[in-house]
């Protein structure tokens, strides 16, 4: 189920303040955030947002196709290293 239309999209207040400040100053520096649940809005297009994946911040450049998705979708939290082969070998 999606979020109710009357509530609107979720975006962290601190992230919104940083974006508005950068848009007023025409600044495009990297914004660091821990808010993976924030929805990408049209005002974010062209910005680079460093999203925390639990270990480090992953820079994500926002494009038009990303609008409506969550920031956390573009910063994977798990790394798959592959299945370990059996060390004993065949009998």
UniProtKB/Swiss-Prot annotation:
GO terms for biological process: ribosomal small subunit assembly; translation. One of its GO terms (cellular component) is small ribosomal subunit. InterPro entries: Ribosomal_uS19, Ribosomal_uS19_bac-type, Ribosomal_uS19_CS, Ribosomal_uS19_SF. Keywords: Ribonucleoprotein, Ribosomal protein, RNA-binding, rRNA-binding. One of its GO terms (molecular function) is rRNA binding. Protein S19 forms a complex with S13 that binds strongly to the 16S ribosomal RNA. HAMAP family: Ribosomal_uS19. Belongs to the universal ribosomal protein uS19 family. This is Small ribosomal subunit protein uS19.
């Amino acid at each position: 189920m999606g979020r109710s239309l009357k509530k609107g999209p979720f975006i962290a207040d601190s992230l919104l303040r940083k974006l508005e400040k950068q848009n007023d100053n025409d600044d495009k520096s990297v914004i660091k955030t821990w808010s993976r649940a924030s929805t990408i809005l049209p005002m974010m297009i062209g910005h680079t947002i460093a999203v925390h994946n639990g270990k480090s911040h992953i820079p994500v450049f926002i494009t038009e196709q990303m609008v409506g998705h969550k920031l956390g979708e573009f910063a994977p939290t798990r790394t798959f290293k592959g299945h370990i082969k059996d060390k004993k070998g065949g009998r």
